[in-house]
């Protein structure tokens, strides 16, 4: 199971880095040729993307290590730390872009080579669709926080690239303020996205409980065992790919210690099967 998880997250990271590298090359060309502020915003976003993805790729290698004497609960929280790093990079790029865009609002420039910007934006949308498709499959198989954060960001990038395309087209037809206005919008999107990722990462670092729906599934599965009379003291958290669950089973007084131990093992197996993922109970 661990090998499967490692395969999926590394495949996602490699595909993402290849696609983003192609987009960076194309956007750099288009920005240098056109001088578009919104294209610069899109380029800045892609540069932050590849930095964050590379960082996630390195951190995931550490997060996938098995538990050791110094980290008895494993290294899964390294993913959440990577998420905080992503949030910081994205917030920084958003602030820089906002300053540049506001300056361009007061000093609008007529864009050149607009057609190149249009084709590069279409190319970027196609590359982003490939990334989102791969990441959706990976998240479905692994529930990786780092890949999930990336996926949310790239879904937003589809809108971002479409907005850049529209801004360049409007500027081509003489609406000079369209480019910096859209660039300010991109900056706002980056800042909002960084907050969302930071909040999700903080939840995992602070051991936030699993969703109520998942906790209810734990209760339902546990109570479905014929020898379980009740369940209390359920505590949960997530660390990387592993769901940590603690609970107390209420059993009949006449059960032997050996039978009670077997019931606990059987309930643990039932919960693990229910979630079809790595569970520590």
Placement of each model-derived feature along the sequence:
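Histidine-centered catalytic/metal-binding microenvironments
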Residues: 20
